[in-house]
Amino acid sequence: MKKLFVCALAAAMMLAAGCSSGSSSSSAPSAASPAAPAASQAAGSEAAGGDASLTTVTPGKFTIGMECAYAPFNWTQLEKTDTAVDIGSASYADGYDVVMGKYIAEQLGLELVVKPIAWEGLEPAVNNGEIDAIIAGMTATPERRENVDFTDPYYESKMVVIVRKDSDLTNITSIQDLSGRKVQGQLNTLYDTVIDQIEGVDHVTPLATYPLMVVALQSGEVDALTAELPVAAGVVASNPDLTYVEFAEGSGFEADTSVSIAVKKGNTALLDAIQSALASVSEEDRQQQVPALAAEGQVIHRAGRL
């Protein structure tokens, strides 16, 4: 079964390589907006019924929520491919989280359904029974643990900043070198709150999605964006006028950058089942695939989201 997961990710990367030259539209609307399609049915396992001990939102289906605008973890595209999932309105979701969701659904004997949901709506959606789980590059912060239960991390990254390639910030070595500069993060995420670790920073009001943030950076409204490395790599691969800066240990942000899967508080049966599926894929396989997807320029992909 582990081989299925790795092969699916390899397929996603090959498809991306053939399409990453598509048009890049920085002003394209995000799939994570409130107007995003409400639901989708996806090609997952054809098994009927699945694990009888599991109760899911829709019997026989594993329904997950994600932004569908956070490449390389998840994004929206217009083409139907082997790894993509139909989300309605002639659009498809793809990315690491989608492949992960497919693999887990396969292990549970269920069919995968993906719902595009704005970031701030993900926790309410899992708690009100709209979705079974959140697979969206989400970090298990203490605050979130009060509202939902998390699996062990399925990927661990590190935090960087994205800057314009012609900026004098390309050679900085510490986050404190950003003092006095305009720095922006994503709304309601760790990537916004950590900005205050920079002394004297001009903490710009966060935006909801990276497509909007990239526009702000390219237009000069802000000097730098915070992001985790795979996302930054994807942004840079799609936007040759941008680059990202990594920091040595002790000079960067102090933050937990691991990501986990969330379920409704107290849904132990589903949590344990998902955890078991994750355990069947080695940490090495999980860690290697995200950077590979990012390197293929996944941020624009076929839909040109950034």
Q: Which residues are covered by each model-predicted region?
A:
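Periplasmic-binding protein-like
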Residues: 156-163, 237-278, 296-306
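Ligand-binding clefts/hinges and TM-proximal coupling segments of bilobed small-molecule sensing domains
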Residues: 21, 48-52, 190-205, 244-247, ...
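Acidic, polar ligand-binding/catalytic clefts
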Residues: 106, 111-177, 254
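A ligand-binding cleft/hinge motif common to bilobed small-molecule-binding domains
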Residues: 120-121, 137-147, 194-197, 211, ...
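Extended ligand-binding regions for polar small-molecule ligands
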Residues: 20, 98-107, 167, 181, ...
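Extracytoplasmic small-molecule ligand-binding "clamshell" domains
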Residues: 49-137
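Bacterial lipoprotein signal-peptidase II cleavage site
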Residues: 19-32
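C-terminal motif of bacterial Sec signal peptides marking the signal peptidase cleavage site
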Residues: 14-18
